Amino acid sequence: MKIIFAGTPEFAATALATLLKTEHEIVAVYTQPDRKAGRGQKLTASAVKQLALEHNIPVYQPLHFKSSTEEGLAAQAELKALNADVMVVAAYGLILPQVVLDTPKYGCLNIHGSLLPRWRGAAPIQRAIATGDTETGVTIMKMAAGLDTGDMMLKTICPIEATDTSATLHDKLAVKGAEATVQVLESEESLQKYLAEREVQDEALTVYAHKLSKAEAQINWSQPAAEIDRNIRAFNPWPVAFTPLDDSNNLRIWNSSLSTQQATAAVAGEVIALDKDGVHVMCGDQNAICITNLQWPGGKALNAVQINQTQKLSLGYKFT
């Protein structure tokens, strides 16, 4: 089949790379415009664009598809001229109006990083970890105009491990999403079958995964240890959990685990142990977490061994 692929970050690039191994023809790639990135603020192509260029696939980077502007109408016409059978969308980042969704022969399919209708929205991976879900997955859906409201064609489950961060879970789901997409698109007959058997989402089960903010990454040490640990792992790699230091700078905390250390007289936020595993800090429910990876202001991220070598923290230190 002739496929248009629309996506931007690594999550999408994983799916594109897998599709490129099939016999389908990727007639075009749509991705976000190049953005400034890094310390040098150089214009940088998205992961999807870089992969497309490596395979000599035409790349389109419209700002939008709005029917109210000449630019949007031109983008719509450009896409229509590709005469694609289907369009696969994964973390593209642009709103697609109904006219675009209806352009390919079989419409547009989306790879979403949750088991819909749970965790519709911008941050499904992070919210699943932070909430304490024990499993998540990917959903392949036929796109509709609403936010992640399309009919579900295939769902694949992925367990959430106690050690998972958003980074590690992202990578697992990217692979599962790619595999599920190839399964649906195994043949034109296969696609027709999945479309015919698609399932409407139950609105009563909808939970929204609202966009992350930097402010919510500040650790509240009065919370239970399990909740703090989940938040730390959910906010890795962005926005990264942090706690203020005495000098008004922030200590970034990249990873943690639940601790078995006890200290009956300790208060929430107090360092109760430092050992080969990391820094053990008391939380609001009189259980502790173990910080296993942290970053001092202006420095690099340190593992447990490196943390102890710096000797910057001591027993009794109190995070606020």
Q: Where are the regions that the model predicts?
A:
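An anion-binding loop in the catalytic cleft
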Residues: 220-320
